Amino acid sequence: MSPQTETKASVGFKAGVKEYKLNYYTPDYDTKDTDILAAFRVSPQPGVPPEEAGAAVAAESSTGTWTTVWTDGLTSLDRYKGRCYQIEPVAGEENQFIAYVAYPLDLFEEGSVTNMLTSIVGXVFGFKALCALRLEDLRIPPA
């Protein structure tokens, strides 16, 4: 085994839910008129806090799935990432929350509704941090 492989193997990688809250949960974020706003109904898995679940949705539907490469220093994560800016419990429902996520318009290909919807409601629905997920509302800014 090469020294580089040994180092990576000794550090290890934690399987399961990544902690997205530090980068993608931003309750102090003020939405912009140019943001695409989504409201998701989320039911987190046992042990997953609602803020982490909302942040995971924001991450996995924006930049959280991007592969790390040497050019990462050329692209600003803050410019493109989705942000879970508010979480509120659903009245009368146990373990259900509305997670509000803002996406910068620059994240998506100009003029492509398909690209936007694939990112926002694509593979995130199979995410294991959640028992259930549903897109409740979507606001697209005027062109």
Swiss-Prot record:
Gene3D superfamilies the record matches: RuBisCO large subunit, N-terminal domain
Signal peptide: none
Record-linked InterPro entries: RuBisCO (IPR033966), RuBisCO_lsu_fd_N (IPR017443), RuBisCO_lsu_N_sf (IPR036422)
UniProt propeptide residues: 1-2
UniProt-annotated location(s): Plastid, Chloroplast
GO cellular component annotations of the record: chloroplast
Residues with N-acetylproline modification: 3
E.C. code: 4.1.1.39
Residues bearing the modification N6,N6,N6-trimethyllysine: 14
Annotated GO biological process: photorespiration; reductive pentose-phosphate cycle
Catalytic activity, reaction form: 2 (2R)-3-phosphoglycerate + 2 H(+) = D-ribulose 1,5-bisphosphate + CO2 + H2O; D-ribulose 1,5-bisphosphate + O2 = 2-phosphoglycolate + (2R)-3-phosphoglycerate + 2 H(+)
UniProt cross-references to Pfam families, sorted A to Z: RuBisCO_large_N
Top EC group: lyase
Keywords: Acetylation, Calvin cycle, Carbon dioxide fixation, Chloroplast, Lyase, Methylation, Monooxygenase, Oxidoreductase, Photorespiration, Photosynthesis, Plastid
MF (Gene Ontology): monooxygenase activity; ribulose-bisphosphate carboxylase activity
SUPFAM superfamilies: RuBisCO, large subunit, small (N-terminal) domain
Residues annotated to bind substrate: 123
Predominant cellular place of this UniProt entry's protein: plastid
Known role: RuBisCO catalyzes two reactions: the carboxylation of D-ribulose 1,5-bisphosphate, the primary event in carbon dioxide fixation, as well as the oxidative fragmentation of the pentose substrate in the photorespiration process. Both reactions occur simultaneously and in competition at the same active site.
Assembly and oligomerization: Heterohexadecamer of 8 large chains and 8 small chains.
Sequence similarity: Belongs to the RuBisCO large chain family. Type I subfamily.
Other comment: The basic functional RuBisCO is composed of a large chain homodimer in a 'head-to-tail' conformation. In form I RuBisCO this homodimer is arranged in a barrel-like tetramer with the small subunits forming a tetrameric 'cap' on each end of the 'barrel'.
Protein name: Ribulose bisphosphate carboxylase large chain
Phylogenetic lineage: Eukaryota, Viridiplantae, Streptophyta, Embryophyta, Tracheophyta
